[in-house]
């Protein structure tokens, strides 16, 4: 272990990663305390005896006694209690920083506004299928520090901008920002703040992967850092992209080498082609054999609530993209499915709405105009979205998700698709995006 024993470590904010940090530090023999503004925060019953707890408010006095504060990703460093500690010279880090100090196991680090979970899961499976002892987690599934219990030879981490804010010099084996679109501006203030947080992933990276189609994903790293790119265009030598045959067949390719037809993948839509290419680039960077990666890719069926195929009813296919909680994700889903069904004159019936998080919805206009026959609006920010897309296509309103699904069924015909991709958070009407997705699936299954 490379970790140093020292003074009091105060974990601010419980939840999954907070509990994980408390237990990890306690096991390492540190003096640990924890504070949370909630009177009974989730995980409060999983705190070891001997750890001081202060719940009901962020305990300013306790924070100022800390040698170091471990900030949970749900809490902003801008909070006055945290700023007071920073002003006193107290170090503020997150669980990812603790992980980096505790191990020198190579890390594949993945962030982006969208597709993080799909890419993280897929590259994890590719590594496992190639015989690596890999542990996958971070912002997805298991908290990062818990992964060390597996004694892995490789860590694959999905990282959010909130986690990266408190991480420096991650020194990843390979790092990628998959894409950048407006999200969490309520936390980061503006696009620049969000961009800066995301790009912390590249600090000390040995290799980097970037998206040629998204200039904001390209890192500023030393010229000596090996760089690999992916994009939905013809690739240069040794880069990843797509090649089209004269008959329209689309191939995933590396340089001029055709690797696999897009039609051979379970995961459909151009956004998923980009995800697959990103994984191939990441896999190459950590030395995974191409043949093994392509085999994994052929078997991969995608993730729940992420452009997940639900059912076909009267020749209309229904897709659950409840994880589409921002404009960029929804654009990828509309464009991906819209382009795929356009050949057969199919159109998209789109369910949009929820809590908009201060986003600008106008970038949806042109794709809605091109691919959507109807948009059904739900939730708190329906009026904001309506204003942004007015005139692009037919707009309807629904008070419930069930009503929205029924309206879509009424408006569609054979070869069309119904897509739930709300571009919004779910908490106005649902417990979570999972809950929203499950309710959508139940509504679709009850259609006749």
UniProtKB/Swiss-Prot annotation:
Residues that coordinate or bind ATP: 112-118
Lineage top rank: taxon: Bacteria
EC annotation from Swiss-Prot or TrEMBL: 6.3.2.9
Keyword Nucleotide-binding: yes
Single GO MF annotation: UDP-N-acetylmuramoylalanine-D-glutamate ligase activity
GO biological process terms on file: cell division; cell wall organization; peptidoglycan biosynthetic process; regulation of cell shape
Subcellular location: Cytoplasm
Catalytic activity field: UDP-N-acetyl-alpha-D-muramoyl-L-alanine + D-glutamate + ATP = UDP-N-acetyl-alpha-D-muramoyl-L-alanyl-D-glutamate + ADP + phosphate + H(+)
The UniProt record lists the keyword DNA repair: no
Keywords, ordered alphabetically: ATP-binding, Cell cycle, Cell division, Cell shape, Cell wall biogenesis/degradation, Cytoplasm, Ligase, Nucleotide-binding, Peptidoglycan synthesis
GO CC terms: cytoplasm
Pfam families attached to this UniProt entry: Mur_ligase_C, Mur_ligase_M, MurD-like_N
Enzyme class, spelled out: ligase
Pathway recorded for this protein: Cell wall biogenesis; peptidoglycan biosynthesis
NCBIfam families attached to this UniProt entry: murD
Described function: Cell wall formation. Catalyzes the addition of glutamate to the nucleotide precursor UDP-N-acetylmuramoyl-L-alanine (UMA).
Family: Belongs to the MurCDEF family.
Name of the protein in question: UDP-N-acetylmuramoylalanine--D-glutamate ligase
């Amino acid at each position: 272990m490379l970790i140093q024993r020292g003074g009091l470590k105060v974990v601010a904010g419980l939840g999954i990663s907070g509990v994980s940090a408390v237990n990890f530090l306690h096991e390492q023999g540190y003096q640990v305390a924890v504070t949370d503004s909630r009177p009974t925060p989730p995980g409060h019953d999983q705190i070891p005896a001997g750890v001081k707890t202060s719940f009901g408010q962020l305990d300013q006095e306790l924070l100022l006694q800390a040698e170091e504060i471990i900030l949970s990703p749900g809490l902003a460093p801008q909070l006055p209690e945290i700023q007071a500690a920073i002003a006193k010279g107290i170090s503020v880090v997150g669980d990812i920083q603790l992980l980096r100090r505790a191990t020198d196991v190579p890390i594949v680090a993945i962030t982006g506004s969208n597709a993080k979970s799909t890419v993280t899961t897929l590259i994890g499976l590719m590594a496992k299928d190639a015989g690596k002892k890999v542990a996958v987690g971070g912002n997805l599934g298991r908290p990062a520090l818990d992964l060390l219990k597996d004694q892995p030879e490789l860590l694959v981490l999905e990282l959010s901008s909130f986690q990266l804010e408190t991480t420096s010099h991650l020194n990843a084996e390979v790092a990628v920002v998959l894409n950048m679109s407006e999200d969490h501006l309520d936390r980061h203030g503006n696009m620049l703040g969000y961009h800066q947080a995301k790009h912390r992933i590249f600090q000390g990276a040995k290799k980097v992967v970037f998206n040629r189609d998204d200039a904001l994903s390209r890192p500023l790293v030393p010229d000596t850092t090996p760089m690999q790119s992916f994009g939905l265009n013809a690739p240069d030598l040794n880069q990843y992209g797509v090649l089209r045959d004269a008959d329209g067949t689309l191939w995933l390719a590396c340089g001029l080498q055709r690797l696999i037809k897009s039609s051979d993948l379970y995961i459909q839509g151009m956004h998923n082609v980009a995800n697959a290419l990103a994984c191939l680039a990441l896999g190459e960077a950590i030395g995974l054999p191409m043949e093994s990666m392509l085999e994994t890719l052929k078997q991969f069926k995608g993730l729940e609530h992420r452009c997940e195929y639900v059912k076909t009813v009267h020749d209309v296919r229904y897709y659950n993209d409840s994880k589409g909680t921002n404009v960029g994700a929804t654009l990828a889903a509309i464009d991906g499915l819209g382009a795929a069904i356009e050949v057969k004159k199919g159109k998209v019936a789109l369910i949009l709405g929820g809590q908009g998080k201060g986003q600008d919805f106008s970038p949806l206009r042109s794709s809605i105009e091109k691919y959507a026959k109807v948009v059904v609006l739900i939730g708190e920010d329906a009026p904001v979205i309506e204003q942004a897309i007015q005139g692009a296509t037919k707009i309807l309103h629904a008070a419930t998700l069930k009503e929205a699904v029924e309206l879509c069924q009424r408006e569609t015909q054979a070869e069309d698709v119904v897509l739930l991709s709300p571009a919004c958070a779910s908490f106005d009407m649902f417990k979570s995006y999972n809950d929203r997705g499950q309710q959508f699936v139940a509504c679709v299954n009850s259609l006749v």
